[in-house]
Amino acid sequence: MTELRVKMVESIADIDATTWNTCATSDGRFNPFLSHTFLQALETSGSVGGRTGWRPLHLLVEDDAGLVGVVPMYVKGNSQGEYVFDHGWADAWERAGGRYYPKLQAAVPFTPATGRRVLPVRDEPDLETALFSACQRVAEETGVSSLHMTFLTKAQWQHAGSLGCLQRIDQQFHWHNRDYASFEELLGQLTSKRRK
């Protein structure tokens, strides 16, 4: 692979939708939260950008052969809307004399759904590695405190770890609908203590 060219794009509208969606589905799966339409709706509605604490800085990565991939990226001025509770980290960092914000976040805003965060044009490990490297380079060049990638798939989480990234371990609870016909039927399956 030749030298990477990383474009930092402040609005997803400046990235061709077909290009973005090709990368977002290169693993053969459609994730609505990674679609160009969804991410653009967050921007045009004002849910991200401005004073929300989510400033878009999406990555478009190319080499001499063409497109390598894209990354949904945001400069974060706070920890709101991440569903990762790092306020304690921020407080400790600042008490120690550091500056926790701004930080760089590869994520889907307000969406604690597991999914890929580095999106290569083809589902190939070398391209994914190049995208992880591009993210690290952007973090260094922009002078943010740190780079965070939240709700990665297990495969991408392991890949990031193999590249030397620190791996956060957390716990999520998932609800599965067992074909309940109504909310009342669900409540009927719970003990009185759990029905609060």
What is the predicted function of each stretch?
Residues 1-196:
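N-acyltransferase acceptor-side catalytic subdomain
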